[in-house]
């Protein structure tokens, strides 16, 4: 219970809240950014729900276990198009766009296709680290972008 709360519910819930706060920052952005943010917000909700619906190794066919697996799939399936839409919507910020596209491709590779044998735990943890790191950088970039008026020069020191 405590592991699920600390590993899934708390971080996913905080990212869900962060995405909701970012909505103000992107309300003047193009639709790609707004839709991308909505999809990555859904990804954060699915991540948090993995902790609410624990995976039981003894009863993999149980309803809670099936729902946990469904939330795990929704986590990365919602993230990929969300990150790619944010990359397309932030083309003027080349670094952010390239990073979003790269992470959007790497997360499912690490979460789904790389976990074989010894790599199972490590690959999934790397996918989580990439996902969390992406959230931190994108949040910072979107907040900094919204701090200046439209069509003005970027904030000083950036």
Mark where each language-model region is:
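Transmembrane alpha-helical segments in integral membrane proteins
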Residues: 11-27
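Juxtamembrane loop-transmembrane helix junctions in multi-pass integral membrane proteins
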Residues: 2, 27-34, 59-66, 91, ...
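Short, intrinsically disordered C-terminal tails of secreted or membrane-associated proteins
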Residues: 150-157
């Amino acid at each position: 219970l405590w592991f699920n709360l600390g590993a899934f519910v708390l971080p996913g819930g905080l990212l869900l809240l962060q995405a909701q706060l970012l909505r103000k920052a992107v309300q003047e952005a193009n639709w790609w950014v707004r839709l991308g943010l909505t999809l990555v917000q859904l990804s954060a909700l699915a991540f948090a729900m993995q902790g609410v619906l624990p995976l039981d190794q003894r009863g993999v066919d149980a309803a809670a276990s099936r729902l946990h697996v469904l939330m795990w799939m929704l986590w990365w399936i919602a993230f990929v198009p969300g990150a790619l839409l944010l990359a397309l919507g932030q083309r003027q910020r080349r670094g952010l766009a390239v990073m979003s596209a790269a992470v959007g491709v790497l997360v499912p590779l690490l979460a789904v296709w790389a976990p074989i044998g010894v790599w199972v735990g490590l690959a999934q943890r790397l996918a989580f680290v990439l996902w969390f790191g992406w959230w931190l950088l994108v949040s910072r970039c979107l907040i900094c972008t919204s701090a200046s008026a439209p069509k003005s020069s970027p904030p000083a020191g950036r």
